[in-house]
Amino acid sequence: MKFEDFKIMATASSAPDHVVTNDELATMMDTSDEWITQRTGIKRRRIATEETTSSMCTDVATQLIAQSDLTAKDIDLIAVATMSPDYLTPSVSAMVQGNIGADHAIAFDIDAACSGFVYGLHLVKQMLIANQQKNAILIGGETLSKLLDWSDRSTAVLFGDGAGGVLIRNTAVDKGSFISEDLRTLGNLGQYLTAGQTGNPSPFATDQQPFSPFFKMSGRRVYSFAVKNVPESINDALKQANLTADEVDCFVLHQANRRIVERIADELAVSMAKFPINIDEYGNTAAASEPILLDQLVKQKIIKRGDVIALSGFGGGLTVGTMIMKY
C-alpha cells in the first residue's frame, strides 16, 4: 500500500445553532466588540446548548456516509480528535460508532488539542496500513464552552464549539493523495496552555492537586511558539514533498487567532489570499477548526480536486502538525 493511495473522499461539518456575539460577551465581562475583534479577529462563535461533542461528531459521520457509496458497516475505523469528550469513557469515537451502526469499525480518540486533527491523519494512515483496511472516518470535535471560565475575558472570548471531519479511503482512484507530513511536540512548554485539571479526590492521595477545570493560557508564550514553529513545520513538510510555499494552492490553518495566521503568512512570504479565515464566525474550535474550514472551502469550491493544500494545526501540548496533500 503506497502513501499516495490515501484519499479524502468527502468532508462534512456540524456546529451548534446558538450564536454568541462579542456584544453579548460584553454584557458578561469587561470587554467589547472592538477589543475582541482587534486582538483576535473573532466576531461571534457557536456555543452548545443541548449539543454535545458526540452528537456533533455523529452528525458529521452521518453526513460523510451519506455523501459516499458506503454504508456504516463498510467503515473500518473511526477516530475522533478531541480535548472535550462527553466522558472519559466511553470514548467519543465509540459513541459515534454505536450511534451510526458501524459495527465493524475500530474506534479510538486522539488528544493532541488543536493539532489533533492533523495528528489523526497520520494515525489513521498508519492504522489502515497495519490492519490492511480501506475506509476510515476522522473527525475533530469540541465542546470547549464547558472548559471556559465565563468571567475571564482572556480565554472566554476565544473559543467556540463544533465538529468537522473527513472520509478517508486507501484506494488507487485519482482523487488526490497525502504527500508529506511533519509532527512535533514541545512538552516542555505545555504549562503555557492548560485545561481540565481534575486533581485526585481519593482519600489516599498524598499530593492533593488543585481542581482547575478551565482554560488557562499565556497568550504571549503561545503566540511566540506558533509564529516560530508553525512556519518551520510547514517548510519541513514542503521540503519533504519537493514543493515550495508558492506551489501550495491553499493553507488550511488552525483558527487560533487572526494575528497568528497573518504572521505565519508573512514568515512564509505568501499572500494572505491563500490563507482563508473563518475564526470571525466560529472562534477557536481546537481540533475541529481545520476540518470545519476544510469542509467550507470544499463546499464553496475554493478548494478543488487537484489542488495542493497544507493543513496545519498547533496548540496545547504544545504541539504542531502539518500535512501536505493533493486534494
UniProtKB/Swiss-Prot annotation:
InterPro entries: ACP_syn_III_C (IPR013747), ACP_syn_III_N (IPR013751), FabH (IPR004655), Thiolase-like (IPR016039). Its EC number is 2.3.1.180. Pathway: Lipid metabolism; fatty acid biosynthesis. Homodimer. HAMAP family: FabH. Catalyzes the condensation reaction of fatty acid synthesis by the addition to an acyl acceptor of two carbons from malonyl-ACP. Catalyzes the first condensation reaction which initiates fatty acid synthesis and may therefore play a role in governing the total rate of fatty acid production. Possesses both acetoacetyl-ACP synthase and acetyl transacylase activities. Its substrate specificity determines the biosynthesis of branched-chain and/or straight-chain of fatty acids. This is Beta-ketoacyl-[acyl-carrier-protein] synthase III. It comes from Lactobacillus helveticus (strain DPC 4571). The lineage of its organism: Bacteria, Bacillati, Bacillota, Bacilli, Lactobacillales. The gene is fabH.
